[in-house]
Amino acid sequence: MTARHWLKSYGDTPAEINADRYTSVVELLEGAMQRYAAQPAFRSFGKTLSYADVDRLSAAFCAYLQHDLGVKKGDRIAVMSPNFAAFPVAFLGIARAGAVQVNVNPMYTPRELEHQLNDAGCQTIVIFTGSTPVLAEIIGKTAIKTVIT
């Protein structure tokens, strides 16, 4: 058996998770957000988001997706962003809405982006403003109807 030395750094966190305990990733994360509400969840560019912040912001994003945009279960939403704190908020909001997140490399060329958006059938994209020029080149060749920056 191979030694798993990294487990020493887990502290009180279990090394194994009973996957049958949760009905979804959202349920798992909602429990963590309640348990650790006041603790830092993410740090990015000098700002810290607590688990409570992530809970609140992702719930608001989910509501926006469902009520304002009409996103339904199974819809595919592209996310073209570096690893900023907005990324996990978008992920959880999309998951809470029952949609599917399609991760898009922010370094894609226009041809690569066009292919991925069309292949996945995305009509909505959450995009880092630094990547919008690439999207602007090909948006007319895709089904994208909504751009969220």
Predicted regions and their residues:
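N-lobe entry segment of adenylate-forming
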Residues: M1-L49, D53-D68, K73
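Surface-exposed charge patches
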Residues: G31, A63, L92, H115, ...
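Conserved AMP-binding/adenylate-forming
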Residues: K47-L49, Y64-R111, T129
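Solvent-exposed alpha-helix faces
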Residues: A59-A63, P82, N118-G121
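Structural core segment of the AMP-binding/adenylate-forming
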Residues: R96, V100-T149
